[in-house]
């Protein structure tokens, strides 16, 4: 059985030679150089991912939704009843939630994973990786033990890698859990060094008169637990949650296979910050789908050095933004593989020479 450290060491670097070849190929297509903007850069990034073997393409698509409850809900940081987590997870098995509709539209399968729902019995139809019935209340204790965090990371990494073996080449991450923007804000504040007041938002429509309490809860959680910002596992274990750990595991698992993973919203940014502390190499495999409307979103993305492709003012979570952006990935692959070449039409654009086109 591989350890977490073993798996982290398997994450390959992006192939710069493959990216250079892709750049030359794209520059020779039937268009002015650079005229397809970020689609070109995206195709080149995909070409460099070893799991795609130098040719941008999309096989099977999967959105993995990590579902868990949070002890910090007890602090009054969310207005939705805690039971909504289990109810919505069950709705996902019926295909009726936002992510399910958008994933179906994109031709992706949704994998709903119970990593910590607070229900008496497992919910039929969910993938059962439950660690406990909800995480600890981070305002008064750690979210979980380091051992629990490492085991869940390893389990999710292995599950993700198994999906890759079965033909999935594009992953999306999502989550479900009442009060989970509170631990996400704690992670973002810890790793970026920004004050909780700068990153704590309203989540699922928290009334503004309750925002000060939420900020105070995040500040207390960080002060009490003292997470080490350089240690992603420590941050997740002390002020995170099982859903956040699970998302980090998907990112690490996809990257270990040399495959892309679409981020979703604020929760996924927090998980990505922690995952990048464990393995900086994974950042090259992360594709930011959209800009979350949550307050700390720009701070988290700026720290990651990522620019989102969409700005739809969304803050649903669930993996909805990741599913929505999947056609953009397919479009980048399509231009790379299906457009004609300048040389074949005897077109020489200013700045190009015949030898350039034939190289």
Swiss-Prot record:
Gene3D superfamilies: 1.10.1610.10, 3.40.50.10210. One of its GO terms (molecular function) is nicotinate-nucleotide-dimethylbenzimidazole phosphoribosyltransferase activity. One of its GO terms (biological process) is cobalamin biosynthetic process. The active site is at residue 318. Its EC number is 2.4.2.21. InterPro entries: Nict_dMeBzImd_PRibTrfase, Nict_dMeBzImd_PRibTrfase_bact, Nict_dMeBzImd_PRibTrfase_N, Nict_dMeBzImd_PRibTrfase_sf. Keywords: Cobalamin biosynthesis, Glycosyltransferase, Transferase. Pfam families: DBI_PRT. Pathway: Nucleoside biosynthesis; alpha-ribazole biosynthesis; alpha-ribazole from 5,6-dimethylbenzimidazole: step 1/2. It catalyses: 5,6-dimethylbenzimidazole + nicotinate beta-D-ribonucleotide = alpha-ribazole 5'-phosphate + nicotinate + H(+). PANTHER family: NICOTINATE-NUCLEOTIDE--DIMETHYLBENZIMIDAZOLE PHOSPHORIBOSYLTRANSFERASE. Belongs to the CobT family. Homodimer. Catalyzes the synthesis of alpha-ribazole-5'-phosphate from nicotinate mononucleotide (NAMN) and 5,6-dimethylbenzimidazole (DMB). This is Nicotinate-nucleotide--dimethylbenzimidazole phosphoribosyltransferase. It comes from Escherichia coli (strain 55989 / EAEC). The lineage of its organism: Bacteria, Pseudomonadati, Pseudomonadota, Gammaproteobacteria, Enterobacterales. The gene is cobT.
């Amino acid at each position: 059985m591989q350890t977490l450290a073993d798996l982290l060491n398997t994450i390959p670097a992006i192939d710069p030679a493959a990216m250079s070849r892709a750049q030359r190929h794209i520059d020779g297509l039937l268009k002015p150089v650079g005229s397809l903007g970020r689609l070109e850069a995206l195709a080149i990034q995909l070409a460099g991912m070893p799991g795609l073997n130098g040719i941008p393409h999309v096989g099977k698509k999967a959105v993995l939704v990590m579902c868990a409850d949070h002890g910090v809900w007890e602090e009054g940081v969310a207005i939705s009843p805690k039971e909504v987590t289990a109810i919505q997870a069950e709705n996902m098995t019926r295909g009726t939630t936002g992510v399910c509709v958008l994933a179906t539209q994109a031709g992706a399968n949704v994998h709903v994973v119970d990593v910590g729902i607070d229900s008496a019995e497992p919910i039929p139809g969910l993938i059962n990786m439950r660690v406990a019935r909800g995480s600890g209340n981070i305002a008064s204790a750690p979210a979980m033990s380091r051992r629990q965090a490492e085991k869940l990371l390893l389990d999710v990494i292995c599950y993700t890698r198994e999906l890759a073996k079965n033909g999935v080449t594009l992953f999306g991450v999502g989550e479900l859990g009442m009060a989970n923007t509170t631990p996400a804000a704690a992670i973002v504040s810890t790793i970026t060094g920004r004050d909780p007041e700068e990153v704590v938002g309203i989540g699922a429509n928290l009334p503004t008169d309750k925002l000060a309490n939420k900020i105070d809860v995040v500040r207390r959680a960080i002060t009490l637990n003292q997470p080490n910002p350089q240690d992603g596992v420590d941050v997740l274990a002390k002020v995170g949650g099982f859903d956040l750990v699970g998302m980090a595991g998907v990112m690490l698992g996809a990257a270990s296979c040399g495959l892309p993973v679409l981020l979703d919203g604020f929760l996924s940014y927090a998980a990505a910050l922690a995952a990048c502390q464990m393995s900086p190499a994974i950042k090259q495999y992360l594709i930011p789908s959209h800009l979350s409307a949550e307050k700390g979103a720009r701070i988290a993305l700026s720290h990651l050095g990522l620019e989102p492709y969409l700005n739809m003012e969304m803050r649903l979570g669930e993996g909805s933004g990741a599913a929505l952006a999947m056609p953009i990935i397919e479009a980048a692959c399509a231009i790379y593989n299906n457009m004609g070449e300048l040389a074949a039409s005897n077109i020489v654009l200013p700045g190009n020479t015949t030898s350039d086109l034939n190289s």
